[in-house]
Amino acid sequence: MSIFLCFLLLLPLSLILFKKLLPSKGKLPPGPIGLPIIGNLHQLGKLLYKSFHKISQEYGPVVLLRLGVVPVIVVSSKEGAEEVLKTHDLETCTRPKTAATGLFTYNFKDIGFAPFGDDWREMRKITTLELFSVKKLKSFRYIREEESELLVKKISKSVDETQNSSVDLRKVLFSFTASIICRLAFGQNFHQCDFVDMEKVEELVLESEANLGTFAFADFFPGGWLIDRISGQHSRVNKAFYKLTNFYKHVIDDHLKTGQPQDHSDIVSVMLDMINKPTKADSFKVTYDHLKGVMSDIFLAGVNGGANTMIWTLTELSRHPRVMKKLQEEIRAMLGPNKERITEEDLEKVEYLKLVMVETFRLHPPAPLLLPRLTMSDIKIQGYNIPKNTMIQINTYAIGRDPKYWKQPGEFIPERFLDSPIDYKGQHFELLPFGAGRRICPGMATGITMVELGLLNLLYFFDWSLPNGMTIEDIDMEEDEGFAIAKKVPLVLIQTSHRW
């Protein structure tokens, strides 16, 4: 049976649901006219946030699209985002379900994609207490500092071995963030772990995230699962999922080995105790699926998100020599010459680095589209009626580049945040790299500290330049597809140890 024939068989049911989901009254947001059955799917490219941005430029900051039989509201303004994430936070703080997210979160047993409710509250409480609290952030400081030292030693070694050597920063920084995340969350030191190959871990994260971000026919059409199976989509996603699950199995088995040394008491150990030694006071039962769901959130978001942010920051600095020079001069002036080791206390001394980070988040947010929300009741956004069970997407990429909020929005100008109250912590809705409200990213502080410390080391100890014959205009800024904004073409720079 062909895919086309399957699609024809599903048409009658799709038409019925399409009409049922079509709101019959009230002022709805504007949007492009869709085709029968598929709606607006044909108007979307591989980079959804750019497709949404283009549509919003024509139809306005609040747009109604229909993806198959699924109504979707795209919000591309500060004002609309504030209404969704603050005014109507409680009515919109659950998540829609897709085939891929259900699979990679072990039936929504995680934090990021879990529906709003008691289970989500309990899981967030556990992870906040055991991983993301201020106390835990401070206790994991030694891990971040040790891995930063190793990063510097690794690059210094390559400089000593080959003059004017170049470095593929994607590989180096991916290894850096993966090592930190896995040590603080899983208690696994990749440098001493016999079942981990860093090359395979990188492949695992990228493949998992790519499949996690894919849409299936089942997400938009009743009975679409049949087309997913015939097309091979179901098989591809499951193959990636099984690889990820096998990695988690190794981590869990390693924890269950008697006498196996760990860096510290990590969240895997804590949740294993909850699973194997539940107390009578525990009304919420933690399962292995909860454990693996949380591992997915931390591993996929933490590793790739952190590496991407560091790469985009160094890319923008390479494209703007004035900013690079100013930042390195401030860092070296504030930290002093010939410093052997950088600590997290040094982060408080470099104000311009923080401005550079905020500007990077504006142009290259870790999630160009915040994780989708689902309305739990009828609400109004910017005067438009938004029915219950409607998916809402906040386009942070579009908001961060809107000339209504930013002068010269396409330019990388960290000074725009000098003496500005705007930050990235969810209180200023023109800048939302980590979201806002009840579903704000709980690992924000951990991720920021890791990224800033890594960059501080790279910019203090090394001078960076483009490979011979390459100019600023040659730097490729193309973005790759997926949940996160990744640089498609690796950033390769020449590093030299700084001489005082």
Swiss-Prot record:
Identification of the protein by name: Cytochrome P450 71B38
GO molecular function, one term: monooxygenase activity
Top-level division of the source organism's lineage: Eukaryota
GO cellular component terms attached to this protein's record: membrane
Subcellular location(s) of the protein: Membrane
Membrane topology: Single-pass membrane protein
TM helices/strands, residue ranges: 3-23
PROSITE patterns in alphabetical order: CYTOCHROME_P450
Main location: membrane
Assigned protein family: Belongs to the cytochrome P450 family.
Cofactor(s) essential for the protein: heme
Organism taxonomic ancestry: Eukaryota, Viridiplantae, Streptophyta, Embryophyta, Tracheophyta
Keywords: Heme, Iron, Membrane, Metal-binding, Monooxygenase, Oxidoreductase, Transmembrane, Transmembrane helix
Binding site for heme: 441
EC number: 1.14.-.-
